[in-house]
């Protein structure tokens, strides 16, 4: 029988990575990252990537697998994650941890994802037409997809049209779910709003003390300020500071604010899944509680 996949999810700064490491040590397991920015090399401090020592302690997968100038599609991530899970699931219970909802959903739900690689030339042509025109076009060629995509969401609109023009079939007809053939135990970490905000504040200060500004400066020097990843959370604010547009104090305040907003969106996403077992991130015996849940669920799996 295949061992269960253990999933740890929840809002940013809730302590997911720390719990995953502690649990991996206890279960003698491995960790698979489900973070859309930790896949990129050189983006370390601002993505809260596990330290070198932590990665030596426990094998981590799907970290540092792409150059900052490359892109990783959801389909590519899903394929890599599933390969790792299947290669270990007969020996240990792999731990999938992260806050990127779509990465987790692609694995847990077995999302069917069209295998269409990005088409830069087609995307440029579509972008030039304007979002209003594109959305109306999508409504005609794939009304089902258009109902699921916000009229202002240009990225998803263009992706849907891209799949349609490359395959000749609506993206909605190529989607769906193919649930995995192994059991899954989903664990959610969260805490009271004020407590999470304090965690976010502390982590932001720790990132700056650890050299976040210097990391951003090196990345700008090497790749230029127009690198898309430099417009993401934590990096965009420090880029503004380095450009002299805001003070370091303002950059820190903005990072905290934007991280709080991001955490709120993550909480909304994950709370929609009733199969997730939620735990208080500040619980004094968190590791023991989670371990007991896993043991109880494994007993149920064996009995069935």
UniProtKB/Swiss-Prot annotation:
Superkingdom of origin organism: Bacteria
Residue sites binding substrate per the record: 12-17
Database matches in Gene3D superfamilies: 1.10.20.140, P-loop containing nucleotide triphosphate hydrolases (3.40.50.300)
Keywords associated with the record: ATP-binding, Magnesium, Nucleotide-binding, Transferase, tRNA processing
InterPro entries (UniProt xref): Dimethylallyltransferase (IPR039657), IPT (IPR018022), P-loop_NTPase (IPR027417)
Cofactor: Mg(2+)
Catalytic reaction(s) noted: adenosine(37) in tRNA + dimethylallyl diphosphate = N(6)-dimethylallyladenosine(37) in tRNA + diphosphate
Annotated positions binding ATP: 10-17
Region (Interaction with substrate tRNA): 35-38
One GO BP annotation of this record: tRNA modification
EC top class, as a word: transferase
Positions marked as site (Interaction with substrate tRNA): 100
Family in the record: Belongs to the IPP transferase family.
Self-association and partners: Monomer.
Function (record text): Catalyzes the transfer of a dimethylallyl group onto the adenine at position 37 in tRNAs that read codons beginning with uridine, leading to the formation of N6-(dimethylallyl)adenosine (i(6)A).
Protein name: tRNA dimethylallyltransferase
